Each structure stands twice: as structure tokens, then as C-alpha cells.
Curated annotation (Swiss-Prot):
PROSITE patterns: HISTONE_H2B. The nucleosome is a histone octamer containing two molecules each of H2A, H2B, H3 and H4 assembled in one H3-H4 heterotetramer and two H2A-H2B heterodimers. The octamer wraps approximately 147 bp of DNA. SUPFAM superfamilies: Histone-fold. It comes from the Eukaryota. Gene3D superfamilies: Histone, subunit A (1.10.20.10). Can be acetylated to form H2BK6ac and H2BK33ac. Monoubiquitinated to form H2BK143ub1; may give a specific tag for epigenetic transcriptional activation. This is Histone H2B.5. Keywords: Acetylation, Chromosome, DNA-binding, Isopeptide bond, Nucleosome core, Nucleus, Ubl conjugation. The lineage of its organism: Eukaryota, Viridiplantae, Streptophyta, Embryophyta, Tracheophyta.
Length: 154
């Protein structure tokens, strides 16, 4: 590729002498020549490097943590032949987030009541007994105890 030609000093002097033309946004094209067409960009793109965008870089996706893969794994363990719609998956994810928040809030209250700075498995177990009803709480406590035992032994 050939290097760009340098601007002539005479053209620079003309621009300096007439500041009124500089203020006018559009210059008249010389007679006999068509004005150069502006470079058109696809919709949503802006000309130049406005906004600090780097050329050629894609916008990084925000990672959203969900329980969707774990819900799906449990579903396949319980009912291997059944699927789940995206709407139902979203509802299940919201349900798990809600239960998690309730358990965490209850465990935090228990730690505060006992003037302890740390939430331990004991606070979690008590909060499960308080938040979840009857038989569900018993099963959750037994599964939680099993998971903690498995974690500490490995």
C-alpha cells in the first residue's frame, strides 16, 4: 500500500485565513465533481471510536449463575424420560433462589441471636427445621448431614 500524500502547506494557510468557512458544516463541492459519498455503517454502529469501544472486540457477556443444570440433573435421576420447559425451569430456578434466601436470612438471625460471627452447619440445620415444613425438613436435614459427612471425609 502506498503511503498517504502529505497535505500541502498552501491548503493549510487557506483554512487558517478563513475561519468563517470552518464554522460552516458543509463545504461546496467544486463544479463538475460529485461530492464523495459518506461511508455507511450497519444499523447500531457508530462512526469513529466514540464511547471508548475497542476495534474488533466483542462485548463480554455478563455471567448469570443459575441452578438450571443441577435441576436438570436431578430431574434425570428421578424421571429420566421426562423433560422440562424453559418457563418451568425458570420457575424452579426462582423457587430455589427464594428458598436459599429464606434459609440464609434465618441462619443469619440465629447467628446474631447467639452473638456468633459465623454461620455454621448447625445454624443452617436449625434454619432448615424452621423454614421447611414437617417431613420435608427431616429429609432435608438427613440429606444435608450426608452431604457434609461426604465433604469432610474426602
Amino acid at each position: 500500500m502506498a503511503p498517504k500524500a502529505e497535505k500541502k502547506p498552501a491548503a493549510k494557510k487557506v483554512a487558517e485565513e478563513e475561519p468563517s468557512e470552518k464554522a460552516a458544516p458543509a463545504e461546496k463541492a467544486p463544479a463538475g465533481k460529485k461530492p464523495k459519498a459518506e461511508k455507511r455503517l450497519p444499523a447500531g454502529k457508530s462512526a469513529g471510536k466514540e464511547g471508548g469501544d475497542k476495534k474488533g472486540r466483542k462485548k463480554a457477556k455478563k455471567s448469570v449463575e443459575t441452578y438450571k443444570i443441577y435441576i436438570f440433573k436431578v430431574l434425570k435421576q428421578v424421571h429420566p424420560d421426562i423433560g422440562i420447559s424453559s418457563k418451568a425451569m425458570s420457575i424452579m430456578n426462582s423457587f430455589i433462589n427464594d428458598i436459599f434466601e429464606k434459609l440464609a436470612a434465618e441462619a443469619a438471625k440465629l447467628a446474631r441471636y447467639n452473638k456468633k460471627p459465623t454461620i455454621t452447619s448447625r445454624e443452617i440445620q436449625t434454619s432448615v427445621r424452621l423454614v421447611l415444613p414437617g417431613e420435608l425438613a427431616k429429609h432435608a436435614v438427613s440429606e444435608g448431614t450426608k452431604a457434609v459427612t461426604k465433604f469432610t471425609s474426602s
